[in-house]
Regions:
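Ser/Thr/Gly-rich flexible loops in soluble cytosolic domains mediating phosphotransfer, phosphorylation
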Residues: 91-119, 123, 127
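Short internal beta-strands
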Residues: 31-38, 123-125
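N-terminal beta-loop-helix "entrance" segment that forms/cooperates
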Residues: 36-53
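Phosphate-bearing ligand-interacting subdomains
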Residues: 62-66, 71-97, 108-109
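Glycine-rich, highly charged phosphate/nucleotide-binding loops
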Residues: 49-63
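Single conserved hydrophobic/aromatic residue that forms the stacking wall/gate
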Residues: 138-147
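Short, charged/polar "capping" segments at the starts of alpha-helices
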Residues: 39-44, 82-84, 129-133
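Positively charged, low-complexity intrinsically disordered leader regions
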Residues: 1-16, 23
Length: 147
């Protein structure tokens, strides 16, 4: 049997949707920001940067972005973010376009529901990974930590 590896496999549904969202917003001629890289693909992030998309890497950068004559557009990455990020955007009058993968959003809703029902939610994963950060900081009613 011969096993052949593809040079590239393409994007999953959620990543494709997030990237397509950024390209659609670029058509409007506005300055576009993403909170964190839109996806884990340096080639895509670099291509978007060449088209003018700016990546906000921290809460501090986001806090410094304010609505003025124009309202900045910030697109949430495919992996989701913590509730605090949405709150900062709202407080600063920013346009928020949520490109979080629907499957990730579903996990957020389940974790939030179970946490609210009194279940102890254990998140296993890299605490610095965007999906784990989003789950740990957005949807759990009591303080917890990823394992």
């Amino acid at each position: 049997m011969e096993v052949r590896l593809a040079d590239c496999a393409g994007f999953c549904f959620g990543v494709k949707r997030a990237v397509d969202t950024v390209y659609e917003q670029l058509k409007n001629g506005k300055t576009i920001y993403t909170y964190g890289p839109i996806v884990h693909n340096e080639e895509v992030v670099r291509e978007l940067a060449e088209k003018g998309v700016r990546v906000l890497e921290s809460k501090e950068e986001l806090k410094n972005l304010k609505a003025g004559e124009t309202i900045p557009t910030v697109i949430i990455r495919a992996h989701g973010v913590a509730k605090e990020i949405y709150d900062i955007m709202e407080a600063n009058g920013l346009e928020c376009i949520d490109a979080t993968c629907p499957f990730v959003k579903k996990i957020h809703r389940i974790v939030e529901q179970k946490s609210t029902e009194g279940y102890h939610v254990i998140v296993v994963g890299d605490p610095k990974h965007p999906e784990v950060e989003g789950l740990s900081l957005i949807h759990i009613s009591e303080p917890t930590r990823p394992y």
